[in-house]
Amino acid sequence: MNRFKKSKYVIIVFVTVLLVSALLATTYSSTIVTKLGDGISLVDRVVQKPFQWFDSVKSDLAHLTRTYNENESLKKQLYQLEVKSNEVESLKTENEQLRQLLDMKSKLQATKTLAADVIMRSPVSWKQELTLDAGRSKGASENMLAIANGGLIGSVSKVEENSTIVNLLTNTENADKISVKIQHGSTTIYGIIIGYDKENDVLKISQLNSNSDISAGDKVTTGGLGNFNVADIPVGEVVATTHSTDYLTREVTVKLSADTHNVDVIELVGNS
């Protein structure tokens, strides 16, 4: 009986030891696993950081590249729109000049007419001369007058086989002596263009054939006399009249009716 009790106690102690050992083992293993997991997680974060930074930089670069390409595309489109807009404005200006030339051509008594495009005009000599794409081969000749933008702008100074140089009225060294007539009411006074006043942007007319009154606003046209013999081309309007110190001669200043700055097409006119 005593032996049975001892065996029972031994079994209880053994089972208790097993349970305690199992509990301790489970707790220790859980702690190790937790610490090991924390360590692995830390290493993973450290390893992932450079890759995350690289991905972020890569994304930023891709965004910048897209933005740059979009800006370049927009700039190109804007440039193309500006070019087209300039082309349209240029065509409108040229068409208006052509309409004015056709209207004036129908009113002039000229036996020779020739339309030509401006192909060269140097900034250095912008107010002195320009070159046309038509020459002797197309009928251009000296003593022809040049009209554009509704009025007289100059005269032919040199003719080559395929080009013509026009001497502009705004050339301060112009010595072509084109005849003009001033209409004051029913009175017509003839004179000669003797130069250009660049300070006041006016033509100077002298050698008048009459002492008749001349007023500001009187119309001035070509006289049709001398070498340049096409009459009634609009020249401008009288601005003022001044007398010489001895009152024997008068000088008339005239505002040009034609814009000589912006010229694309010109009509050369003359009489054989």
UniProtKB/Swiss-Prot annotation:
Disruption phenotype: Cell shape does not change, cells start autolysing earlier. Neither PBP2b (penA) nor rodA can be deleted when this gene is absent.
Transmembrane segments: 9-29
InterPro entries to which the protein is assigned, alphabetical: Cell/Rod_1, Cell/Rod_MreC_2, MreC, MreC_beta-barrel_core
Cytoplasmic side: 1-8
Claim: Transmembrane helix is one of the keywords in the record: yes
An example Gene Ontology biological process: regulation of cell shape
Keywords linked to the UniProt accession: Cell membrane, Cell shape, Coiled coil, Membrane, Transmembrane, Transmembrane helix
Domain notes: Deletion of the C-terminus (residues 183-272, CTD) suppresses activating mutations in khpB (also called eloR/jag); the deletion no longer interacts with MreD and interacts less efficiently with PBP1b and StkP, CTD deletion leads to increased phosphorylation of KhpB.
Name of the molecule in the record: Cell shape-determining protein MreC
